[in-house]
């Protein structure tokens, strides 16, 4: 049974058990039989199919497979939300909201999402005064959310590690990009990163999956990180044994360098306050999962 036509899920669990009073939208292209979906608790078919969905509903009403009173009920359920949201928009026009409060909540959510995967010799948390080299494109331009249908507008400009490290108590000896996301290895960038790594107590490498490596609408054919990042981590561990890799990704990855780094922290897609959340974990202000 397709999810969008599953009465047990949409009616018996969602409405009867959970008390849901909103409306159900199909996944994009996830509607198989719109009339059957409406019969079993679905409301909107997305993306719009022109008039074909409407014709299916009219045909189902005429042949009795979709009772008109059920269609009326779905319309009432949908319109209840439409009217309520319209009124909320009118009532809220011109009102202000707590931007900093939202940002603080985003930071707390990110902090509680961070997972510590490796911590050899208790390299973490980093003590105040630790000299760190910050390496990686993700440190300057974080991948803080997904794309496509999951894209949302942050309440303020998303942070980067470079924005928050000054208040962390750590001493940043250098920042180097190290690699270009979505590109092949760049020898010049990698060389500069390796040189910076030689002069640090600890090297923080910010790596992970870029916007092309994982996305909606496709299945990954492998679990590798981009070659440029794996090669960079290998080169850095050859000149400094105190390496912590900070990951940003929405899914699982292979870590061929696992045995050669001392720390691995997974921040997933940390949202607009993900950088300060990660810094709080790295410096011990917050305990990771």
Regions found by a protein language model. Give the residues of each.
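Long, well-ordered, tryptophan-enriched scaffold segments
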Residues: 41, 59-89
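C-terminal non-catalytic regions of proteins with extracellular/luminal or membrane-system context
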Residues: 1-7, 11-19, 25-34, 52-65, ...
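Short, compositionally biased low-complexity segments
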Residues: 49-51, 78-90, 134, 168-169
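Conserved phosphate-binding loops in nucleotide/dinucleotide-binding enzymes
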Residues: 31, 36-39, 47
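Helix-enriched interaction subdomains in cytosolic or periplasmic regions
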Residues: 69, 80-113
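Mobile "lid/hinge" segments at catalytic clefts and subdomain interfaces of large enzymes
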Residues: 40-46, 53, 61
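Short coil/turn segments at secondary-structure boundaries
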Residues: 49-50, 73-74, 89-95, 125-128
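Structural preference for beta-strand elements that scaffold enzyme active sites
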Residues: 21-23, 43-44
């Amino acid at each position: 049974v397709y999810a969008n036509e599953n009465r047990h899920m949409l009616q018996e669990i969602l409405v009867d058990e959970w008390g849901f009073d909103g409306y159900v939208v199909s996944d994009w292209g996830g509607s198989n039989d719109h009339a059957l979906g409406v019969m079993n608790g679905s409301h909107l078919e997305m993306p719009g199919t022109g008039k074909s969905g409407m014709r299916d509903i009219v045909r189902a009403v005429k042949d009795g497979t979709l009772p008109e009173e059920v269609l009326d009920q779905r319309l009432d359920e949908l319109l209840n939300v439409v009217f309520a949201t319209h009124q909320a928009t009118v009532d809220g026009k011109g009102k202000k909201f707590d931007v900093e409060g939202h940002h603080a909540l985003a930071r707390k959510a990110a902090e509680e999402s961070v997972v510590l995967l490796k911590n050899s010799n208790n390299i973490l948390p980093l003590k105040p005064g630790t000299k760190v080299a910050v390496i990686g494109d993700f440190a300057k331009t974080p991948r803080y959310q997904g794309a496509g249908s999951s894209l949302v507008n942050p309440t303020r400009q998303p942070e980067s590690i470079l924005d928050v490290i000054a208040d962390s108590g750590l001493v940043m000896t250098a920042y180097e990009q190290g690699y270009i996301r979505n590109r092949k290895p760049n020898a010049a960038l990698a060389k500069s990163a390796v040189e910076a790594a030689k002069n640090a107590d600890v090297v923080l490498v910010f790596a992970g999956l870029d916007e092309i490596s994982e996305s909606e609408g496709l299945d990954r054919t492998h679990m590798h990180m981009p070659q440029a990042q794996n090669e960079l981590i290998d080169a850095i561990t050859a000149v400094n044994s105190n390496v912590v890799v900070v990951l940003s990704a929405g899914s699982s990855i292979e870590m061929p360098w696992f045995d050669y780094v001392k720390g691995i922290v997974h921040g997933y897609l940390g949202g607009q306050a993900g950088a300060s959340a990660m810094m709080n974990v790295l410096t011990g202000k917050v305990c990771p999962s």
